[in-house]
């Protein structure tokens, strides 16, 4: 009942007067539209995320690296993104895995490009996790749950459709303001 509390009413007014509200996933947009009646669908757009052209080109250049048999798991104690469930999944399914943390960004991308997959099982809604998009664009097999909100969107279907969609996001954003 957040929308009935004072902070919810303030958010509703903020959304209602906005010229454009950008969302990270269709599910996120639909959840907000359902709760915030002041917000109109025609003022909404789903951007997902924006990557730099350089990072997209880097991912494209390493996506075909030889893969090992390991699934990567984000080493996290966050209550929303705990690693414990992913570790349990890997162990129950006899999957070789490696916990990852504290890697520089391009090191992480290289690690993903040489790994079989990613296990990512958040405990609450995660609108559009970049780690999952990066793993997809790098050819990783994905083990995800229903909390990864963008996982069923058409652009996320294949490695190349994901890459092409992400490559269009900066233009999609800026073209609105031109």
Regions found by a protein language model. Name each.
Residues 49-108:
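Conserved catalytic-core segment of nucleotide-activated headgroup transferases in glycan assembly
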Residues 17-19, 68, 114-116, 139:
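Short, well-ordered alpha-helix to beta-strand connector turns
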């Amino acid at each position: 009942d957040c929308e009935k509390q004072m902070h919810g009413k303030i958010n509703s007014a903020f959304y209602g007067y906005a010229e454009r509200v950008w969302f990270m996933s269709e599910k996120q947009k639909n959840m907000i539209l359902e709760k915030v009646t002041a917000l109109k669908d025609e003022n909404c757009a789903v951007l997902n995320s924006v990557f730099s052209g350089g990072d997209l080109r880097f991912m494209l250049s390493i996506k075909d690296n030889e893969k090992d048999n390991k699934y990567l798991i984000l080493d996290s104690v966050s209550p929303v993104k705990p690693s414990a469930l992913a570790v349990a999944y890997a162990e129950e399914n006899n999957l070789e895995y490696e916990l990852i943390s504290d890697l520089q960004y391009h090191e992480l991308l290289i690690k993903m490009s040489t790994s079989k997959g990613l296990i990512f099982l958040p405990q609450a809604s995660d609108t559009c996790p970049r780690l999952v998009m990066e793993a997809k664009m790098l050819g990783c097999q994905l083990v995800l749950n229903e909390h990864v909100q963008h996982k069923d969107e058409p652009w996320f279907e294949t490695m190349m459709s994901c890459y092409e969609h992400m490559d269009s996001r900066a233009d999609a954003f800026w073209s609105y303001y031109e």
